[in-house]
Regions:
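Divalent metal-coordination and catalytic microenvironments
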Residues: 22, 64, 158, 217, ...
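Histidine/acidic-residue-rich catalytic or RNA/ligand-binding cores of hydrolases
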Residues: 29-33, 76, 175-181, 203-211, ...
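Short acidic/histidine-rich active-site segments
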Residues: 67, 166, 220-221, 245-269, ...
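Active-site gating/metal-coordination segments in enzymes
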Residues: 81-84, 89-161, 216, 222-226
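Catalytic pocket-lining loop regions of alpha/beta-barrel enzymes
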Residues: 155, 159-242, 248-249
Length: 315
C-alpha cells in the first residue's frame, strides 16, 4: 500500500485503521499568541489533547487528521508533541482558512503555492513533519474573489503533489458546490476532494448534488448538537447509506482540544459531547440502531479514509 505523510513519519495507508478525518488539537489566534506569550498554556494544551487522544484510541480510533490551517494557529510542535505522547497516528494539514485577511490581496496564486509546497515536500515550520492533506475553506460569504484565489491555491498545490484536499464549508449556503466548481475549473479530480461539514444539514437532495460529482462528504461535526442534533445527523447518514452513498462518506467531530474562540465553560454548555470519544461512544450505536450495518460503519470509518489517502500522484 502507498504511504501518507504522518506527523511521526510515513504511514502505510493499510495501517490507518479507524480514522477521524476532521479534528483539531488546538485553534489559537496566531497574532494573540505572538502579542501575549501567556495567551495559551502550552503544557496544559498538550496534556489535555494527549488525554483526549488516548481515550479515543482506547475506543478503537487509530488515526486522527488534524485539519488546522496556517491562519487558525497550526502549531506543528504542539501537534507533534501530542502525537508522540499519545502514541497515535496523526496527519497534519497545510492551507488556509476562509477568513479574508488583508495580506492575501497582494499575493498571486502561484506565489502562495510556492510558499506552501515545502510544507508537503520538506517539512512544516522548520521540522521534518510533512503535511499529508490540504485544507481549503469557504464560509457564508461564498466564493468571493479572494476566496476563489485561496481555492485555486489548494487546487494547484494538490495537482502539484497529489495530496488530497479537505474543506470547510457552510452547507446551508451551498458553498461546497461552489468549491467543486472552482476545483473543476482548475482540473482537479473531484473524487480526490472531501467536502466538509456536510453533516450540518438534513437536505439529502443537496448532499446528493455534491456526491454525484464524485467527492467524498464529511459528516464531521458530531457533538455540535446546537447546530444539528446527533439524531438528525445520524438519520441523514442512514438515509444516504440506503441510497447507496456509503462509499463517499467519512465521519468526524471537528472537535478542538483547545479553542480560544470560546471559554471552556461556554463549550461545555453548548457542546458537552464535543470530543474525540463521541463517535465511538454514542454515534456508532445510534447508527446501528438506525439500521446502518457494521460493514457500512467500517466503510465510513476505515475504508473511505484509506481510499482518500491512497489516491496519490501529481497530475
Amino acid at each position: 500500500m502507498p504511504n501518507v505523510n504522518g506527523v511521526l513519519g510515513p504511514i502505510d495507508t493499510a495501517d490507518l485503521g479507524f480514522t477521524l478525518m476532521h479534528e483539531h488539537v488546538m485553534v489559537a489566534t496566531p497574532a494573540m499568541r505572538q502579542a501575549f506569550p501567556d495567551w495559551i498554556d502550552r503544557d496544559a494544551v498538550v496534556a489535555n489533547a494527549t488525554t483526549e487522544l488516548r481515550a479515543a484510541m482506547e475506543r478503537g480510533v487509530r488515526t486522527m487528521v488534524d485539519l488546522t490551517p496556517i491562519n487558525l494557529g497550526r502549531d506543528i510542535t504542539v501537534i507533534r508533541d501530542v502525537a508522540e505522547r499519545a502514541g497515535t497516528q496523526m496527519i497534519a494539514a497545510t492551507g488556509f482558512y476562509w477568513t479574508e485577511e488583508p495580506w492575501f490581496q497582494g499575493w498571486e496564486v502561484d506565489r502562495l503555492v510556492e510558499r506552501l509546497l515545502p510544507d508537503i515536500t520538506t517539512g512544516i515550520q522548520g521540522t521534518r513533519v510533512r503535511a499529508g492533506i490540504i485544507k481549503a475553506a469557504t464560509d457564508h460569504l461564498g466564493v468571493t474573489e479572494l476566496n476563489r484565489k485561496l481555492l485555486q491555491v489548494a487546487a494547484r498545490l494538490h495537482r502539484a503533489t497529489g495530496v488530497p484536499i479537505s474543506t470547510h464549508t457552510s452547507v446551508h449556503h451551498h458553498t461546497g458546490l461552489g468549491q467543486q466548481d472552482v476545483f473543476a475549473e482548475e482540473g482537479v479530480d473531484l473524487s480526490r476532494v472531501v467536502i466538509g461539514h456536510c453533516g450540518d444539514t438534513e437536505d439529502v437532495e443537496h448532499l446528493e448534488q455534491i456526491l454525484k460529482r464524485g467527492s467524498t462528504i464529511g459528516m464531521d461535526r458530531f457533538g455540535l448538537d446546537f447546530m444539528l442534533p446527533m439524531e438528525k445527523r445520524v438519520s441523514t447518514i442512514a438515509a444516504l447509506c440506503k441510497r447507496g452513498w456509503v462509499k463517499q462518506m467519512v465521519l468526524s467531530h471537528d472537535a478542538c482540544c483547545h479553542i480560544d474562540w470560546f471559554s471552556k465553560e461556554m463549550v461545555k454548555q453548548l457542546a458537552p459531547r464535543w470530543s474525540f470519544r463521541h463517535i465511538p461512544d454514542d454515534v456508532l450505536p445510534a447508527l446501528r440502531a438506525d439500521g446502518v450495518s457494521d460493514a457500512d460503519i467500517r466503510t465510513m470509518t476505515v475504508d473511505n479514509p484509506r481510499r482518500v489517502f491512497e489516491r496519490q500522484g501529481a497530475y
